[in-house]
């Protein structure tokens, strides 16, 4: 993208993490804060997993709240991922859940209570750690709980339940956002889109 910008492509970007913001600026890409934009034409992002319906698990980079804010505000979302991220059912990759630090263990217990109600059992979960022994804090100051729930038979239902739990800031289920996935493979790229 930076090469295309140097060659004359006119774009304005709004990154979803401080690290991406810094990188984009260093490469000469014009960056603005999201609130400065009237609309966002296109979100291009990665995914930790995607299923045949283009439902996604995102948040491996701990920017899921900001990523979902931008995806929701965008006219279109295109995902770029390698073939290993394509799954029949979501859940192989642990589901990131962004949680407010206040009452975080209470929130964690509520999540597990609801998992049992959804038939997902007592899935193991762990707090995402930063380098060393400290808990990772997102750019927004929240914690990330990685939930290893295994296959998720109904991502819509799980997302709806997580949305009701006080303390859950956001979750990494991106349902209905992606319009197309560009899958990188050894022989080139393959396009996966809603039929």
Predicted feature residues:
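Glycine-rich N-terminal segment of FAD-binding domains in flavoprotein oxidoreductases
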Residues: 1-5
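Short active-site oxyanion
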Residues: 7-13, 55
